[in-house]
Amino acid sequence: MIGRLRGIVAYKAPPWLVVDVNGVGYELEAPMSTFYDLPELGREVTLYTHYSQKEDSVSLYGFLREGERRLFRDVQKVSGIGAKIALAVLSGVTVEEFARMVQAGDITALTRIPGIGKKTAERMVLELRDRAAQFGAGGALPTGSGPAPADPLSDATVALQQLGYKPAEAARMARDAFNEGDEVATVIRKALQSALR
């Protein structure tokens, strides 16, 4: 199993990134919480990883903080929840915000996260409430900001679609959040914050 990677950021376009470790490029899927704090291309990064192997695919997920990886794993223990929804949780709210929602039984706030309906939110509260206090952000690693992609509006729209939003809704959210000069991570962060209000 691969538990951690340290290498050079070779590529990043939400939700995908490639980390070059001694000449081997590891492709990882990561939540927006990780993308917000990734160093720029060509800089070193250390990521906590989660390796997943299924019949037809092998996936590697990356997180800047141990607490995010722990939450990613715990959320998937809830029946009916997979990696896509776990990534949406970490892309929409912080570990601490999610813990507060679960502890308070705030079904309404949980259903604002893409892919989570009322029944799923209720299951999350029921199955995670006892562990919610243990969700911790963990230590943050050195961060930086990357260069703006060629088309942050388009990239943000694609990233929002991959988080579970319908194409028209993702395009509207990205347009509403976009300001000239914004990086893709900024557009996505503002769009998700707006959607969760």
Swiss-Prot record:
Chain residue ranges for the region called Flexible linker: 144-153
Location (main, coarse): cytoplasm
Organism superkingdom: Bacteria
GO-annotated biological processes: DNA recombination; DNA repair
Region spans: Domain III: 153-197
Assigned keywords, A-Z: Cytoplasm, DNA damage, DNA recombination, DNA repair, DNA-binding
Alphabetized GO MF terms: ATP binding; four-way junction DNA binding; four-way junction helicase activity
One term under GO cellular component: Holliday junction resolvase complex
Region: Domain II, residue numbers: 65-143
Record note on domains: Has three domains with a flexible linker between the domains II and III and assumes an 'L' shape. Domain III is highly mobile and contacts RuvB.
Stated family: Belongs to the RuvA family.
Name the UniProt record assigns to this protein: Holliday junction branch migration complex subunit RuvA
Organism: Stenotrophomonas maltophilia (strain K279a)
